[in-house]
């Protein structure tokens, strides 16, 4: 799979590798959040996660209806939740969590350096320095990861935990520890 990445990026369009990557992870991941850009493919990914290798312990397959392959703070996100071989579906409305934004352009990324700086800014300033869209996307998706990891019993509590970790500076401290460990 490592050799397919550069070719996939060079193609510039989604390919079968976008679907196979999360399913063929050699680490045997049992808990994960998987974003799918094409809504029609999401049930297939969820079904495969439910069946592969005994099935995912807990996974969320997500599709933001604005065309995002992640949980979107703009409009509804469709969710396929996989637990112990079973798939259930639900809709996630960011307004329910006070994290809805109206302008999708506010989520637009840049080059890797700009994107990294944006994340660092979000982690360094719990108020997000005016980047409400970035903070909403971060909390919605981090909340899903915390929930799927089994740290909290509900998605709502996952968002609350993510918010607390960002607000206290613990998220930034964890990033700094990771960098030191990696020698970066």
What are these regions (language model features)?
Residues 1-184:
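Glycine-rich anion-binding loops and their surrounding alpha/beta cores
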């Amino acid at each position: 799979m490592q050799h397919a990445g550069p070719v996939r990026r060079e193609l510039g369009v989604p390919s079968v590798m976008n679907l196979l990557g999360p399913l063929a992870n050699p680490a045997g991941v049992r808990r994960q959040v998987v974003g799918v850009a094409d809504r029609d493919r999401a049930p297939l990914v969820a079904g495969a996660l439910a069946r592969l290798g005994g099935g995912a312990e807990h996974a969320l397959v997500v599709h933001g209806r604005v065309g995002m392959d992640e949980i979107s703070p703009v409009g509804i996100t469709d969710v396929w939740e996989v637990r112990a071989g079973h798939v259930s579906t639900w809709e996630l409305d960011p307004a329910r969590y006070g994290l809805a934004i109206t302008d999708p352009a506010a989520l637009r990324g840049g080059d890797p350096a700009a994107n990294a700086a944006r994340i660092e800014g979000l982690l360094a300033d719990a108020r997000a320095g005016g980047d409400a869209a970035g903070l909403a996307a971060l909390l919605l998706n981090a909340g899903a990861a915390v929930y799927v990891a089994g740290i909290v019993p509900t998605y709502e509590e996952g968002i609350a935990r993510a918010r607390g970790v960002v607000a206290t500076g613990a998220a930034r401290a964890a990033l700094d520890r990771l960098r030191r460990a990696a020698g970066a």
